[in-house]
């Protein structure tokens, strides 16, 4: 992600006081149906009619998630080698996931079984927002993840600028990333960039603003 930003003149070392890149993984071994268990999934369908049991869950290494947790000042995750946790902040979905966790529902990744480290979801998210939108990410031991499962890469960063004008320089570049001719010509793949400067300033003033940039797997491999 950082290398792609440099293509449009956004040098992370120059514009961000702090930034971290973290991958997110998916695999057919962990779908919503498998993550919740059959009984709880069937119950969830009554409330969320659009969900499918074959929808892929998102997975993160515990070391990667804890980098984000430290940046946002949230609780870090502690799990043993045979355990997993789920982070989230979207109450309606968290409530359903808690039912699964409370009964000790186990998941299987690459032939190894993992049990819940907590009996409920840990409050958390991987991209800051004024709305609670995180429906759940499985946090697993680093060794549980295979690199071929990598699907997205996130970059979370704090602007260096102290004034609204300084931050606006980076803001304008970030929100226009998907239309940038340099990126399109480089054929690095699909990119999504979000900035919450306006909403954040309206509610909390102009402190350090956290943004995230998500890139699909194809982008990561081409620029790594």
Segment roles from a protein language model:
Residues 3-220:
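Basic-flanked hydrophobic alpha-helices used for secretion and membrane insertion
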């Amino acid at each position: 992600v950082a290398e792609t930003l440099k293509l449009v003149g956004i040098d992370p070392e120059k514009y961000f006081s702090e930034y971290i890149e973290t991958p997110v993984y998916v695999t057919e071994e962990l779908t919503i149906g498998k993550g919740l268990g059959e009984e709880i999934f069937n119950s969830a369908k009554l409330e969320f009619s659009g969900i499918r049991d074959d929808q892929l869950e998102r997975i993160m290494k515990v070391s990667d998630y804890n980098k984000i947790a430290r940046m946002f000042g949230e609780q870090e995750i502690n799990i043993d080698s045979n355990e997993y946790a789920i982070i989230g902040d979207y109450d309606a979905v968290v409530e359903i996931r808690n039912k699964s966790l409370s009964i000790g529902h186990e998941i299987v990744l690459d032939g190894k079984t993992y049990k819940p480290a907590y009996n409920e979801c840990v409050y958390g998210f991987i991209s800051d927002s004024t709305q609670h939108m995180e429906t759940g990410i499985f946090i697993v031991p680093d060794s549980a993840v295979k690199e071929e499962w990598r699907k997205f890469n996130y970059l979370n960063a704090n602007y260096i600028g102290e004034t609204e004008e300084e931050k606006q320089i980076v803001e304008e570049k970030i929100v226009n990333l998907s239309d940038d001719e340099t990126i399109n010509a480089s054929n690095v793949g699909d990119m999504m960039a979000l900035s919450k400067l306006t909403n954040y300033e309206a509610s909390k003033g102009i402190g350090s603003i956290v943004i995230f940039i998500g890139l699909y797997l194809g982008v990561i491999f081409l620029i790594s």
